[in-house]
Amino acid sequence: MTEYQPGLEGVPATRSNISYLDGKQGILTYRGYRIVDLAEHSTFEETAYLLLDGELPTVAQLERFDTQLREHRRVKYNIHDIMKSLPVTGHPMEMLQTAVASLGMFYPNHVPVQIRSPGDETEQYVYGQSIRILARMATLVAMWQQLRLGNYPMRQRRDLSYAANFLYMFNGEEPDPLVARIMDVCFILHAEHTINASTFAAMVTGSTLASPSYVIAAAIGTLAGPLHG
């Protein structure tokens, strides 16, 4: 007979094949690579590819991946209008959850009725949508900052890296290269933290074959909770 565990306390949800964390020893690895090495030698774009694909990219693969991220940074005016209608006093996480959930309405690009069963077509769809959401996430945050200040959001710059473009859109001016690199490292350090509450929420939502925008919106809502940590 299975013992009842309220709140799943002490019950392992799953084992991560993506990252390993040992807080006591100060160890964090992504796909077997030490975080200190990635922070020193990698970029956020390369690290994101590593997390999504499982292996570090070749030069050609990284160029193609980076191009995809740059191509999908822009968001439709419909998303801008939705964000503009939100109260500027609202919490940024509430805005982000709303905006990400709305992406699925304007950028469906989905496998017909929603993903009937797992398979190659589904994996390609999820991978493509993950890239699109990742590309637009920083844009949404930067747009919200400008809207809160009463400004019109800055246009994205495809000549800038992911981190540099975020800072440019967020602050309204091109960042110093050192500041952009610091932001890049911050993105690397926060890219993956094993099976926490928001990851678990994403796994539960994804297990129903919900679209990626729903999955990430659920994770954002969980991340916003004060007990998440």
Report the location of each language-model feature.
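Hydrophobic alpha-helical bundle cores within soluble ligand-binding/oligomerization subdomains
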Residues: 1-227
